[in-house]
């Protein structure tokens, strides 16, 4: 029987509670559970990894061509996911690699779809979207507005990898969203 989960954190909790025998979980959330950090008050036991399915990318999306680096997000309105969500902590990790905190931006807390709508309507400057590329929220936005992905440079990627071993460096090919 197929069941719909409520996200990685809830899925881990259901495994531990015994209400699920098998569940999907993002690698960062699994690390939080194992280490008892961020989404988890203490170390979680009673789960293990079976397989990795696909890679999700931390995508920083904007319709403003002047925003080229994460540092350019300072003072800008940025959707960083729901408070306490995996996206939220990914955003905090990436901002931190650039010496920025949540206080350095004007944070909004929105879903992928709401973030794309807010970008389309000019209500926010950028959004963190964590999903496999391509993802519908970005694809749909790119069909209606000039859309840009903000890149991380190698110096700051190295800083991020030093503190968060659940990330890996990857490149999203230009043609994934923007054609040739």
Over which residues does each language-model region extend?
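Sec-exported extracytoplasmic/periplasmic mature domains
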Residues: 16-20, 35, 65, 96-100, ...
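Short N-terminal helix-initiation segments at or just after the protein's N-terminus
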Residues: 2-5, 19-25, 89-94, 129-145
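Extracytoplasmic/secreted proteins, especially bacterial periplasmic and envelope-associated proteins
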Residues: 10, 14, 19, 45, ...
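Short secondary-structure transition/capping segments
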Residues: 20, 42-58, 97-100, 129-132, ...
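Short, glycine-/small- and polar/acidic-enriched structural segments
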Residues: 1-74, 79-82
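Bilobed "Venus flytrap"/periplasmic-binding protein-like clamshell domains
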Residues: 1-2, 55-121
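Pocket-lining segment of extracytoplasmic ligand-binding domains
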Residues: 27-29, 37-38, 102-180
């Amino acid at each position: 029987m197929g069941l719909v989960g409520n996200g990685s954190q809830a899925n881990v909790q259901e495994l531990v509670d015994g209400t699920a025998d098998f569940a999907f979980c993002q690698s960062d959330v699994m690390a939080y559970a194992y280490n008892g950090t961020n989404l988890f008050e203490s170390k979680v036991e009673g789960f293990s990894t079976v397989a990795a399915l696909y890679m999700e990318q931390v995508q920083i999306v904007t319709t403003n061509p002047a925003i080229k680096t994460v540092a350019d997000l300072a003072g800008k309105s940025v959707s960083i996911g729901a408070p306490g969500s995996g996206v939220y902590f990914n955003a905090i990790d990436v901002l931190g690699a650039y010496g920025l905190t949540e206080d350095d931006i004007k944070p909004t807390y929105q879903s992928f779809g709401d973030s794309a709508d807010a970008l389309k309507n000019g209500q926010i400057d950028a959004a963190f979207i964590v999903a496999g590329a391509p993802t519908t929220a970005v694809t749909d936005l790119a069909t209606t507005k000039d859309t840009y992905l903000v890149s991380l440079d190698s110096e700051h990627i190295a800083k991020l990898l030093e503190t968060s071993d659940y990330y890996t460096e990857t490149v999203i090919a230009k043609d994934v969203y923007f054609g040739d």
